[in-house]
């Protein structure tokens, strides 16, 4: 009899102390679009105008053009990465930017 009452008492304590699980509301976060990229330092560029066969050609020295191209590739990578990241989190909004 003592064992039965001990079992009933312990079951009563376990059931009596339990609570219903609280429902946690999941908040969706939509990150903002990144800030615009700053322009290339144009002071580094040395544009040149050359006239060849009566036609004017605008260009820059080879070393400057390579640095400029590296910067443009970095900009392209940055924009692609940011767009991919932001579109992943904003896919519920079905924006035209993310298609």
Swiss-Prot record:
Periplasmic side: 18-99
Lipid-conjugated positions (S-diacylglycerol cysteine): 17
Protein's GO biological process: viral release from host cell by cytolysis
Keywords, sorted A to Z: Cytolysis, Host cell lysis by virus, Host cell outer membrane, Host membrane, Lipoprotein, Membrane, Palmitate, Signal, Viral release from host cell
Disulfide bonds: none
Residues of the signal peptide: 1-16
Membrane-protein topology: Lipid-anchor
A GO cellular-component term linked to this record: membrane
Keyword match Membrane: yes
Covalent lipid sites (N-palmitoyl cysteine): 17
Keyword Membrane on entry: yes
Cell compartment(s), UniProt: Host cell outer membrane
Subunit organization: Interacts (via C-terminus) with the spanin inner membrane subunit (via C-terminus). Part of the spanin complex which spans the entire periplasmic space. The spanin complex is composed of spanin inner membrane subunit and spanin outer membrane subunit.
Function: Component of the spanin complex that disrupts the host outer membrane and participates in cell lysis during virus exit. The spanin complex conducts the final step in host lysis by disrupting the outer membrane after holin and endolysin action have permeabilized the inner membrane and degraded the host peptidoglycans. Host outer membrane disruption is possibly due to local fusion between the inner and outer membrane performed by the spanin complex.
Protein name: Spanin, outer lipoprotein subunit
Organism in which the protein naturally occurs: Enterobacteria phage T4 (Bacteriophage T4)
Gene name of this polypeptide: y13J
């Amino acid at each position: 009899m003592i064992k039965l009452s001990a079992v009933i008492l312990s079951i009563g304590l376990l059931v009596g102390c339990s609570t219903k699980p609280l429902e946690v509301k999941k908040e969706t976060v939509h990150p903002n679009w990144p800030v615009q990229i700053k322009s290339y330092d144009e002071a580094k560029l040395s544009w040149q105008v050359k006239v060849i066969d009566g036609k004017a050609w605008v260009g820059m020295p080879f070393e400057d053009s390579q640095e400029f191209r590296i910067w443009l590739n970095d900009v392209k990578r940055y924009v692609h990465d940011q767009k991919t990241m932001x579109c992943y989190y904003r896919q519920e909004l079905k924006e035209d930017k993310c298609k």
